[in-house]
Amino acid sequence: TLKAITTVYRIIAMASKDLHLNLKGEYFHAIRAGKKVEEYRLYNNYWRKRLEGREYERLIIKWGYPAGHEAHRIINLPYFGYEVKTITHPLFGPDPVKVFAIKCDVNWMLRGEK
């Protein structure tokens, strides 16, 4: 049944050690160029469930939803965690919001991160 398939998919996804983020091109290219070192997600139950208390090995950043042959639309980084911050950003409206700031520095080796 569809419910059983969905349950199996969720179990497999939970066992995954990779955090996947799909981004708009503007943000993907800024990360790839090293100009953007954090990707923001609203601090809400959806993202709390996916980030808090979880240990990931890799951060997979994708420009949209790339097809199998579009490797140039994927950035594969070690996962360095996140910080909870309050920011103001046009994407979230005019008021300050609480976010998960997921670390995504492509130049991490140059900065001596482990």
Residue positions per predicted region:
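Catalytic phosphate/metal-binding cores of nucleic-acid and nucleotide-processing enzymes, i.e., regions
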Residues: 15-114
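Short, Lys/Arg-enriched N-terminal segments with co-localized hydrophobic residues
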Residues: 1-13
